[in-house]
Amino acid sequence: MNTFKTYADRAARHPNGCAKALFELMERKQTNLSIAADVTTKKELLHIADACGPYICILKTHIDIIDDFDEDLVAQLCELAKKHDFLLFEDRKFADIGNTVKHQYGKGVYKIASWAHITNAHTVPGEGIITGLREVGLPLGRGLLLLAEMSSKGALTKGSYTTESVEMARRNQDFVFGFIAQHKMNEKDDEDFVVMAPGVGLDVKGDGLGQQYRTPYQVIVESGCDVIIVGRGIYGNPDQIEFQAKRYKEAGWNAYLERVQKH
């Protein structure tokens, strides 16, 4: 199964350009860490991006919560992505009909498709949401993740919802290259979906607001996910951002090496 191959092997065989670029980057930097920078000021976001940049493969943003957003922020994020060799993932979670998301993705204040290598979407509206996003993103070489599972307590993303999300992805592999999920989604030998898992923590089990945490070992080795998404565990203490980023990078990479060796 592709999940158990090295990132380099998966990059060499992957038909999706965005997934190929991500796997090559992960192998090159020896990291499967994504930082979830859920902060509300331009200064904080840029500081986290620069401090964590050497240790991550992906910077995950919520650009619409930045109080002082401007076009210079996007320009600086793109420069930092080049400087430190990481991809930008706008965690937009699109959830409307195709014609609406097409404009939300390509136009408006944020013009997400112009700078974010990756974005994501709920599948609740049906397959039209993928069609609308693809129209904008595919010509730019962007990639889409579908939300198949979430890490919050009581989430409704399970059962038939998850199953149908996987089927939608299979029908749209030119643009959809993976999932936000809690375990591997590859069931066939000829498919290789990237799975990014939120809710990863080394020190805590929850946050009191429904978030549930698992360790990098649980996520990568036991559940077969590919990228660990970490937020407050890294930047919660401003004085330890680089230390924690390096710590999670090493934990995630060591878990990956163990998974590959086991198979």
UniProtKB/Swiss-Prot annotation:
One of its GO terms (molecular function) is orotate phosphoribosyltransferase activity. The active site is at 93 (proton donor). Substrate binds at residues 38, 60-62, 91-100, 213, 232. Pfam families: OMPdecase. Keywords: Decarboxylase, Lyase, Pyrimidine biosynthesis. GO terms for biological process: 'de novo' pyrimidine nucleobase biosynthetic process; 'de novo' UMP biosynthetic process. Belongs to the OMP decarboxylase family. This is Orotidine 5'-phosphate decarboxylase. It comes from Rhizomucor pusillus. The lineage of its organism: Eukaryota, Fungi, Fungi incertae sedis, Mucoromycota, Mucoromycotina.
